[in-house]
Amino acid sequence: MTQLLNRSLIMLLKSNIIVQDVQSYVVQFGFEAILKEAISFDKVDVVKSLNKLRAVSTTELFLASSNNALKVAEWLVETKKANVNMCSEIFKDTPLNSAARHGSYKVAEYLIAKGAAVNGYEGALLGPPLYEAVSGKYLNVAKLLLEKGAAVDQRKSGETPLHAVAKNVRYTSKDIKDDEIYKLLVSYGADTNAKVEFRRVGFSIYDGKTVSEIAEFKVALAGESE
């Protein structure tokens, strides 16, 4: 039943019918369900209509960033005055982190233009925006961040973005030097000899290893902890 309702909601959003009588559909589907799907499809008119019924939180900028919902992001920043550098309580990251994590190029570009800090906050649990873009293999977002001044060797849990490339390459037969993101990072001066710093808490199979050592470490260990 839930899946059927979700499919019906998505069809209504795609056809723009829902914006004609959003209050009735809120009764049927629920405010939060409509808001979530409206943002994911970048239906800013629906989001605006929902805002008339109940104030839409500026923290929805995280969801808009994850979904590359540029129109919604613009409305949240320019009309709702959302802070592009707001920090999430759980992950200690910003909307730009969310955009980088999901490869949302258009929103990442917009957020930076509006003053988003390209290096995010120190101590973000999932790493700085560049690390997240590299880890997700989003070359265009990584290039954008570097062009806008992102620190090429900024670490996440002791690892630089080059270490993230090495981890991605590790499970393939590719030579790391042929990887486009590797070449991009090196062109911006990334340290190819950097070692993974030992963590204060926990253990990683990568601790103390260089980029090349990680890339060549092809055999996965049972129960390994990254």
UniProtKB/Swiss-Prot annotation:
Which keywords fit this entry according to its UniProt record? Answer: ANK repeat, Repeat
Which Gene Ontology cellular component annotation is one that this UniProt entry carries? ubiquitin ligase complex
Q: Which GO terms describe its biological process?
A: ubiquitin-dependent protein catabolic process
**Which SMART domains does UniProt cross-reference here?**
ANK
Name where the ANK repeats lie. 56-86, 91-120, 125-154, 157-194
Per the UniProt entry, the signal peptide is none
The portions of this protein that span the membrane are none
Pfam families for the chain: Ank_2
Query: What is this protein's name?
Result: Putative ankyrin repeat protein RF_0939
Q: Which organism is it from?
A: Rickettsia felis (strain ATCC VR-1525 / URRWXCal2) (Rickettsia azadi)
